[in-house]
Amino acid sequence: EISACLVGSEMCIRDSGNLVAIITMFFIFAMISFVTNLAAPFGTIWRNEYAGSNTLGMMGNMMNFLAYLFMGIPAGNMLVKIGYKKTALIAMAVGFLGLFTQYLSSLFGAGAEVFAFGEYVIKLNFVIYLLGAFICGFCVCMLNTVVNPMLNLLGGGGNKGNQLIQTGGALNSLSGTLTPLFVGALIGTVTSSTAMSDVAPLLFVAMGVFVAAFIIISFVAIPEPHLQKGGVKKEKFSHSPWSFRHTLLGVIGIFIYVGIEIGIPGTLNFYLADSSDKGAGIMMNGAAIGGAIAAIYWLLMLVGRTASSAISGKVSSRAQLIAVSATAIIFVLIAIFTPKDVTVSMPGYTVGEGFMMAQVPVSALFLVLCGLCTSVMWGGIFNLAVEGLGKYTAQASGIFMMMVVGGGVLPLIQQSISDSVGYMASYWLIIAALAYLLFYGLVGCKNVNKDIPVE
């Protein structure tokens, strides 16, 4: 029997049918990663279309995450007004629309010039693609808002709730592993003729998955404990999450963390797919190899989350955050200072040859290893930032969801740097970001506002 109890309430849900709801939430967790991780490998196509501009190549990722800034708090309000199930159904419909819009970019607008962006002339098909990525961002924001509190509720909160979230996170990482692998395999080598139509089969599969998910969720009974009853007045608090220093610094930490998580593999993918002198020097199947190696990063995030869930009962979130931040700094420094001609064999994948070993710079290996470190950062920052918030926790959750926009902003800045001074030099931005997380774990996470009543 699976039970879930509301914190601060005598209401308790006990229903073996919750197993179906849990499996459904796991499925949604995987979908979040699938949609999010389409942006970076798709970016290799647009990057090539615009003369190797890494900044424009990362714009799809930026639009995907920009949606969080607009949808973070409204998505939380939707849970209260219409419940988990309807919010999830709306998210699935929006996700289908976003993917379909991206597919339309392969059919229309390739010859229609819209406006100039520096030295580049932006075509209508790129604008359509960015619109689709933005719409998909609304989808994943709503799904994120549903899945985390729902799994915590179904697990009864506490360690069991966290265990379900960690399991969902593992499936999220598995999905993130497969997505760049599939896209890279479909693209192969990026050439002047490579277009969105080459990845249309994956978009069709994704749209089909959203339709199937919509149908499944329609028939699944999901508990709605937070659904607001008519006539309930919204409680007004004397303070806000911003009143707590450790929460404010944690909000900044979430913004930075998501940028790190996306920026490391995203830039690495571009680096390996770039056959010019700026790139890694891989002349054949660069996009496929880059996608496969980026997939290893997400696979290591799966390993890291699994390991973290096993030790979290004995090792504090603070200790984990300090350890992984320091380790990641070392890995990235090694990657920056190791010459490109120092290589190592790593597994790749192409449609024609299947799995194979590819020679890549050693830098790629150390950047991939960062996946072990980034895997536990979200949970660590979140737990430390909401510690001692009490009744302000729900408000803080909405703010954290908005700060996921960092996954679009920081990688875009990193690509701008890479356009100017090179791929490896752009990782100094990642070093600075990791240094902030190390500071947060050492000093910034301490609650210095315990005088504020939270009950």
Locate predicted features:
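C-terminal ends and interior cores of transmembrane alpha-helices
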Residues: 93-121, 327-356
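Short, small-residue-biased leader/transition segments that mark boundaries at the very start
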Residues: 1-13
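Central cavity-lining transmembrane alpha-helices of secondary-active solute carriers
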Residues: 59-77, 295-307, 406
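Intracellular juxtamembrane helix-capping segments at the cytosolic ends
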Residues: 142-156, 375-390
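Helix-loop-helix hairpin linking two adjacent transmembrane segments in secondary transporters
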Residues: 161-221
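Extracytoplasmic gate region of multi-pass secondary transporters
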Residues: 39-40, 243-295
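Extracytoplasmic
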Residues: 20-52, 144-148, 264-272
